[in-house]
Amino acid sequence: MKLAFSTCWNSRRHKNGSEMISEIINLGFRHIELSHGLRVSHLDGILAARKTEDFEISSVHNFLPMPVEIMTDAPDCYEFTSHRKQDRERAVRLTRQTID
């Protein structure tokens, strides 16, 4: 069984994604979940760490990074089940961007 450590634990303390990943690796974890609270500023560092660090991204929690218009951790800011069509469409777009 593989145990993954979530970036939810330390993403708020880091502006640089590489430093965030290194902190988790230094605790002995090699499987990492990318949490919904990641910001655009984390992405370049995470991608750079993929080239230099020994870890696997085991899962993605919701879409990421958080949309720039969302100022706090809000994993349910755009729901697929929303009664508002615009919110449902935004959830789909953000999820597709995450997958790409």
Regions from the PLM with identified roles:
Residues 100:
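Divalent metal-binding pocket/active-site signature
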Residues 1-97:
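N-terminal pre-domain/capping segments
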